[in-house]
Amino acid sequence: MAQAEVLNLESGAKQVLQETFGYQQFRPGQEAIIDTALSGRDCLVVMPTGGGKSLCYQIPALLLDGLTVVVSPLISLMKDQVDQLLANGVAAACLNSTQSREQQLEVMAGCRTGQIRLLYIAPERLMLDNFLDHLAHWNPVLLAVDEAHCISQWGHDFRPEYAALGQLRQRFPALPFMALTATADDTTRQDIIRLLGLNDPLIQISSFDRPNIRYMLMEKFKPLDQLMRYVQEQRGKSGIIYCNSRAKVEDTAARLQSRGISAAAYHAGLENAIRVDVQEKFQRDDLQIVVATVAFGMGINKPNVRFVVHFDIPRNIESYYQETGRAGRDGLPAEAMLFYDPADMAWLRRCLEEKPAGQLQDIERHKLNAMGAFAEAQTCRRLVLLNYFGEGRQEPCGNCDICLDPPKQYDGLNDAQIALSTIGRVNQRFGMGYVVEVIRGANNQRIRDFGHDKLKVYGMGREKSHEHWVSVIRQLIHLGLVMQNIAQHSALQLTDAARPVLRGDVPLKLAVPRIVALKPRVMQKSFGGNYDRKLFAKLRKLRKAIADEENIPPYVVFNDATLIEMAEQMPVSASEMLSVNGVGMRKLERFGKEFMALIRAHVDGDDEE
């Protein structure tokens, strides 16, 4: 491509960004990726969820003369992307199994005639021989592979159907490739380059940091009560709650519903029609909370998810990062809350040991251990997370539970001696719950049957809470003074390191347990904008009415960040409206008049109810 032509395309990229997508400036890394794609060179893009990956191939698609093909793993994700592109006036379509034959033929005709600029397709459909024959005649100019980590067995979400994509390089040797992912360590990145056959690619790795997400951890004591309190504090905000089993998903959703909370279960065992209904209600703000297994989320592009809860610890940091990344995609404050119990880690380790030995098991063990270290960290959680991905950060973030409420320590020798002595006196045969009951002097038949109500240690810790003693024992496990014997129903047993503590030969500091979460943030202060909250509420109401009428999710009209900017700037003319991020020419034409009329009426005081 001639130099003058490349320069012309590059200047056109900024124009497309502003006029079509309504953004005034590129985010870090986007411009370099777009320029590289326009020059015909392969790219590997590692950019956080919500960092603007999609624009990296959508803008070149509108500047290059031909068809851009986007490989995407989920139908819901394709549909969502196409809806948003159509709302911006972009000729986009998808091919998937939910379409009738007539619909599919219509899309293929649009690709053949050049009417369609962006085609979204699943990998298994793309790799059919007859489809590749069609594609060869459609003048493809760019192939974008989204969720590219799925091609690598080192990745946390390997999908066999992605493995076949490597054959595309032989079929289309001159076609520029762009591989995109939010989560890939160095090993996974090298795998993606090798398996897709990328030629001397630009490797653009943006920071993994999502500064608008507050990373929090709450120790499990009475998990359901803690979860209910946490959800009620969110006051109707959109959220996702992840659990590790279908049964727990169903139970948690039912308990939330019984408290009058708008929640629904989502997992792979439900009928497809039910899953689609839950997803659409959530996308359209008709459902507050989805309780889900990891089957939910990869196809979700809802920008205003304000919190993500992991009710069970994930198996690796990559999954945790990707799932928490569903929150705050609009750039506004969001929260990631991890409920943690070391027993959950023990269960995951036991499940792992039941798998066949070999390299894959070793990889999974390494990743699980890293997740456990994140949960048990006593330093800034964001630092642990970012340094896992190799960023080498050193400054604490000031926006996680550790930074906001540093662990407080106390002289824990006496508590440790009571706990260790009780474990020894009950002959190291009982689990944590029973040991705590003995320490606190519980009056129950089981303790009397074993005669443990006659022990010296019985009731020695009754003045402190159940949660306090659970925390003490967990810390003794972390310190290597106690072990849980999984083979004996997680019975607590003393290690040799417990002896000097029992004798009082060494000092011992313990952390005060974290039982109550920090107060949720107020969006107005955290966002930093002095916006009119009443106007924001009116704009949301108008957006919902338009979205319902047009049968699209509300954020396809405008996302929350755009509405907040409107509520701050109060634009009442076309030029003022176009200066708001997220308002392009097409959206101004479609929706601008109604929003400007509402703002004008609000400013004039003519719309008081």
From Swiss-Prot:
It is an enzyme of class 5 (isomerase). Zn(2+) binds at residues 380, 397, 400, 403. Gene3D superfamilies: HRDC domain, P-loop containing nucleotide triphosphate hydrolases, Winged helix-like DNA-binding domain superfamily/Winged helix DNA-binding domain. The keyword Ion transport does not apply. Requires Mg(2+) for helicase activity. It comes from the Bacteria. Keywords: ATP-binding, DNA damage, DNA recombination, DNA repair, DNA-binding, Helicase, Hydrolase, Isomerase, Metal-binding, Nucleotide-binding, SOS response, Zinc. InterPro entries: DEAD/DEAH_box_helicase_dom, DNA_helicase_ATP-dep_RecQ, DNA_helicase_ATP-dep_RecQ_bac, Helicase_ATP-bd, Helicase_C-like, HRDC-like_sf, HRDC_dom, HRDC_dom_sf. GO terms for molecular function: 3'-5' DNA helicase activity; ATP binding; ATP hydrolysis activity; DNA binding; four-way junction helicase activity; metal ion binding. Residues 223-371 form the Helicase C-terminal domain. Residues 529-609 form the HRDC domain. GO terms for biological process: DNA recombination; DNA repair; DNA replication; SOS response. GO terms for cellular component: bacterial nucleoid; chromosome; cytoplasm; replisome. Its EC number is 5.6.2.4. Its cofactor is Mg(2+); Zn(2+). Pfam families: DEAD, Helicase_C, HRDC, RecQ_Zn_bind, RQC. An ATP-dependent DNA helicase which unwinds DNA in a 3'-5' direction. Binds to and unwinds a wide variety of substrates including 3- and 4-way junctions (including Holliday junctions), flayed duplexes, 5'- and 3'-overhangs, blunt end duplexes and G-quadruplex DNA. Involved in the RecF recombination pathway. NCBIfam families: PRK11057.1, recQ, recQ_fam. Belongs to the helicase family. RecQ subfamily. PANTHER family: ATP-DEPENDENT DNA HELICASE Q1 (PTHR13710:SF105), DNA HELICASE RECQ FAMILY MEMBER (PTHR13710). This is ATP-dependent DNA helicase RecQ. The lineage of its organism: Bacteria, Pseudomonadati, Pseudomonadota, Gammaproteobacteria, Enterobacterales. The gene is recQ.
